[in-house]
């Protein structure tokens, strides 16, 4: 990620978290041990799989008052990778992500509820200039491990389905399908 976009991503996350004083433990996403992947239909007979290679995030876990916990993720759209350079370039173009105009997609929690095995997290997903409220069921975040020793970290996993058309991404809906299945697996290191 270039320096200015990385600064923008971190600044956006800092602003998101500064709006409310939060207690709890703060964790930064470790991109080396995390992934943001997706799949969508191809011609209704198979699936195209892809991932985003450049992202950052921050989680605040407040075990005493889980409603004060928060989750944020910023993804550099230009880092889309479907293992096909020509297709990736097309996905970055105005027909799809329009990466020059909308360089980031992001999720920022607005409400967190502790549930068995994890958290139910409502928040705003911003993609292609459109902000939409979604709810994620995050598994994990309760178990803290020290690996390597002295480095506390947590992990979360979530899957969701969004519709491209709801984010004004309507090109080739018949060929590629409207539904996009997203999986996020993230390890985060205590700050």
List the predicted regions and their residue ranges.
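C-terminal segment of classical bacterial N-terminal signal peptides
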Residues: 7-8, 15-22
């Amino acid at each position: 990620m270039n320096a200015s976009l990385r600064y923008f991503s971190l600044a956006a996350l800092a602003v998101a978290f500064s709006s409310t004083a939060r207690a709890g433990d703060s964790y930064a996403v470790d991109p080396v041990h995390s992934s943001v992947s997706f799949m969508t239909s191809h011609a209704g007979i198979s699936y195209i799989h892809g991932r985003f290679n450049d992202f950052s995030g921050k989680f605040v876990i407040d075990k005493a008052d889980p409603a004060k916990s928060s989750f944020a993720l910023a993804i550099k759209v230009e880092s889309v990778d479907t293992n096909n350079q020509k297709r990736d370039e097309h996905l970055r173009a105005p027909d799809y992500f329009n990466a020059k105009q909308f360089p980031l997609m992001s999720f920022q929690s607005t409400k967190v509820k502790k549930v068995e095995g994890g958290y139910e997290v409502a928040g705003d997903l911003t993609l292609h200039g459109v902000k939409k409220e979604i709810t994620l069921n995050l598994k994990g975040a309760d178990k803290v491990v020290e690996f390597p020793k002295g480095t506390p970290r947590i992990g979360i996993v979530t899957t969701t389905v969004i519709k491209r058309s709801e984010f004004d991404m309507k090109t080739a809906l018949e060929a590629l399908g409207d539904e996009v299945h997203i999986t996020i697996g993230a390890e985060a290191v205590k700050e």
